[in-house]
UniProtKB/Swiss-Prot annotation:
UniProt name for this protein: Polyribonucleotide nucleotidyltransferase
Function of the molecule: Involved in mRNA degradation. Catalyzes the phosphorolysis of single-stranded polyribonucleotides processively in the 3'- to 5'-direction.
Family (UniProt): Belongs to the polyribonucleotide nucleotidyltransferase family.
Statement: the UniProt record of this protein carries the keyword Oxidoreductase: no
Gene3D superfamilies attached to this UniProt entry: GHMP Kinase, N-terminal domain, K Homology domain, type 1, Nucleic acid-binding proteins
InterPro entries referenced in this protein's UniProt entry, alphabetically: ExoRNase_PH_dom1, ExoRNase_PH_dom2, ExoRNase_PH_dom2_sf, KH_dom, KH_dom_type_1, KH_dom_type_1_sf, NA-bd_OB-fold, PNPase
PANTHER family per the UniProt record, alphabetical: POLYRIBONUCLEOTIDE NUCLEOTIDYLTRANSFERASE, POLYRIBONUCLEOTIDE NUCLEOTIDYLTRANSFERASE 1, MITOCHONDRIAL
Positions bound to Mg(2+): D487, D493
EC numbers for this chain: 2.7.7.8
Cofactor: Mg(2+)
Length: 712
């Protein structure tokens, strides 16, 4: 490969995409700088020279955000980037998933793919640039990668599909789809949608694949020009004689163990066979490498038999039919003090979701590379070790938990009511209590139940289902509601969430070379049937959102003030607003358009705070009549409080009809008198009159007396 800088360009969605090689990071096995519009991403690929002594492929994909890319300095005391943001973790997963299946079985060399985002143009996706850069860095390197792959974002505006939509277009789009794959097939889909029909989602996937083919052809040209020769790597293989011996010893018993229906009993039966075989070789003083190979052979026996049973005999590990869903059970309102809770159980998978409602000030503030600054709807997913009957240290959420939480959030977001209709921040937490496959989809079902229990007026209830596929040659079986073993040993994990009207989220990972359109179509339709079945079960537990919020949820009052008066409510250095909060114990959030949200558990305090704000922003008009309290008496007149924060002066000459010698002869401090606004001067001072009202009253009495005399 030439070390001179070379530049390659292609048009992508009306914007130029440029790839530069040979100048940066030349000690990596492969490195490219991808420029897309003003977005710039440096992608590198490196690999260890020797294979690692592990029983899996050690691939790490990192998508690294740098705040200098958007001209920001990190907050906090340290002033440098810390742990990856949620968006960065999701982008890393997005790149990892289509790349991972394209390394040969038995490849054990450690591979690290790093993409550093160096400049961001919001209309030109840094994730898509990083995906293309990661594929190219691997493809031009000497690492034995069977790519290239490419990805594309697809939107839909007014029924028309759009590739890599701009920020403005994304706001109008009812689909946000990321599709990735090779030139021959799709191997990864990640999508959010606004209740879009299955047929439309399939069309969008195929539309994205057409663009992928063009981007792969572009990459192949670059590989032809600057690619290194792939290195010869010895793949991990088990010894043929050992393979035969282990199979003769274990195959029959393992086949029987696999057909035990209950998860833990099946695992115990399989482990018993494994233990017997391992002990046999330990007695012969086999070394660690041999024992590792024995474990590998035993795993393959299980995998082959499970796949054969599903594809040929149409028997699933737990005895279900291909489209059969495990027994369902649901419950709501099981936690008294929470704002809403939902327990969803599907076979041996169980999720407890809790909904918490907060004021709009409780939104999550995002400090990243995107345009979005805050988030009022959140879904967090926790997967404790006890859910699978294991022990391990309790740490913060890993990549998988963040990914599953984001999938649930994407599935539910389209049905969350607008801020105008429901001025609350909504946080969902899904606790996985039991796991045997499809926990992310169980968390979606549990979250829907929790929000309905909390009284969130959802546009429609959402349910999710995980589909699987096992394909051997021309034989294939599509599985509804896959359990852990089917997910682990199958060829596809295809999660579909949505309402009765359409899809709201889709996530697909394929471990084989790819799927035909026909199989995808069949899987989507089978998923729809399963989803509707689950929805009907959920609606039998709670038919619609509760009409009243929990007694423990905050009550929110919305009011509108003149935007020019916002500064009066806040006061100098926030003194006024802090005084209201201290006096009433409420939370106050003010939007730039003058919308004010007052929230607390106590409705009485909300009303009190509202009255205070109304008084602050209330404007005095000439001609208005007030009943006010005398606050101060001077020689020239009396100061009267019309309402909180607003005083006016009744001059001594305006106190009474007759001449007044001393103000105190008519009023004293604390008296409540009725006054009329007669003038507001240029300095905003309010002049009041009691005399005018007394005169009007006198004239009314005189007119009444005159009428009385005429009638006599």
């Amino acid at each position: 490969m030439s070390q001179e800088k070379q530049v390659f360009s292609i048009d992508l969605a009306g914007r130029q995409l440029t790839v530069e090689t040979g100048q940066l990071a030349k000690q990596a096995n492969g490195a490219v700088l991808v420029r897309y519009g003003d977005t710039a991403v440096l992608s590198t690929a490196t690999a260890s020279k020797e294979a690692k002594n592990v029983d899996f492929f050690p691939l790490t994909v990192n998508y690294e955000e740098r705040l200098y890319a958007v001209g920001k300095i990190p907050g906090g005391f340290i002033k440098r980037e810390g742990r990856p943001s949620e968006k960065a973790i999701l982008a890393s997963r997005l790149i990892d998933r289509p790349i991972r299946p394209l390394f040969a079985d038995g490849f054990r060399n450690e591979v690290q793919v790093v993409s550093i985002v160096m400049s961001v143009d919001q209309d030109c996706s840094s994730e898509m640039a990083a995906m293309l850069g990661s594929s190219l860095a691997l493809s031009i390197s000497d690492i034995p990668f069977e790519g290239p792959i490419a990805g594309a974002t697809v939107g839909r505006i007014n029924g028309e599909f759009v590739i890599n939509p701009t920020v403005e277009q994304q706001e109008q789009s009812d689909i946000h789809l990321v599709v990735a794959g090779t030139k021959d097939a799709i191997n990864m889909v990640e999508a959010g949608a606004d209740q879009v029909p299955e047929e439309t989602m399939l069309e969008a996937i195929m539309f994205g694949h057409d663009e992928i083919k063009r981007l792969i052809a572009f990459q192949e040209e670059i590989v032809q020009a600057v690619g290194k020769e792939k290195s010869e790597v010895k793949l991990y293989e088990v010894d043929a004689d050992l393979n035969q011996a282990v199979r003769e010893m274990a195959e029959k018993d393992m086949h029987s163990a696999i057909q035990v229906h209950e998860k833990h009993a099946r695992e115990d039966a399989i482990n018993e066979v494994k233990k017997r075989v391992i002990e046999h070789y330990e007695a012969q003083e086999a070394d660690a490498d041999t024992l590792g190979q024995v474990n590998e052979i035993l795993y393959k026996i299980v995998k082959e038999e499970v796949r054969r049973l599903i594809t040929v005999e149409k028997i699933r590990p737990d005895g279900r039919k291909g489209d059969e869903i495990r027994p369902l059970a649901s419950e709501v309102g099981i936690l008294s003090r929470t704002h809403g809770s939902g327990l969803f159980t599907r076979g041996q998978t169980q999720a407890l979701s809790i909904c918490t409602l907060g004021a709009l000030g409780d939104v999550q503030i995002l400090d990243g590379l995107g345009v979005e600054e805050s988030k009022r709807f959140m879904h967090h997913y926790n997967f404790p070790s006890f859910s699978v009957g294991e022990t391990r240290p309790m740490r913060g959420p890993g990549r998988r938990e963040i990914g599953h939480g984001a999938l649930g959030e994407r599935a539910l977001e389209p049905v969350i009511p607008s801020e105008k209709d429901f001025p609350y921040t909504v946080r969902l937490v899904s606790e996985v209590l039991e796991s045997n496959g499809s926990t992310s989809q169980a968390s979606i079902c549990g979250s829907t139940l929790a929000m309905m229990d909390a009284g969130v007026p959802l546009k429609a209830p959402v349910a999710g289902i995980a589909m699987g596929l096992v394909k051997t040659g021309e034989h294939y079986t599509i599985l509804s509601d896959i359990q852990g073993m089917e997910d682990h040993l199958g060829d596809m994990d295809f999660k579909v969430a949505g309402t009765a009207h359409g899809v709201t989220a889709l996530q697909m990972d394929i471990k084989i070379d790819g799927l035909s359109r026909e199989i995808l179509e069949e899987a989507l339709q089978q998923a729809k049937v399963g989803r509707v079945h689950i929805l009907n079960h959920m609606l039998s537990v709670i038919a619609e959102p509760r009409t009243e919020l929990s007694a423990y949820a905050p009550k929110i009052i919305t009011m509108t003030i003149n935007p020019d008066k916002i500064r009066d409510v806040i006061g100098p250095s926030g003194k006024q607003i802090n005084k209201i909060i201290e006096e009433t114990g409420v939370k106050i959030d003010i939007e730039q358009d003058g919308t004010v949200f007052i929230s607390s558990i106590n409705q009485e305090m909300n009303d009190k705070a509202k009255k205070i704000i109304e008084d602050i922003v209330r404007e005095v008009q000439v001609g208005e009549i007030y009943e006010g309290k005398v606050k101060r008496v001077e020689k020239f007149g009396a100061f009267v409080e019309l309402f909180s924060g607003k005083d006016g002066l009744v001059h001594i000459s305006e106190l009474a009809l007759e001449r007044v010698g001393k103000v105190e002869d008519v009023v004293k401090i604390g008296d409540v008198i009725t006054v009329k606004v007669i003038e507001i001067d240029k300095q905003g001072r309010v002049n009041l009159s009691r005399k005018v009202l007394l005169k009007e009253e006198q004239e009314k009495e005189a007119a009444k007396e005159e009428n009385k005399q005429e009638q006599q």
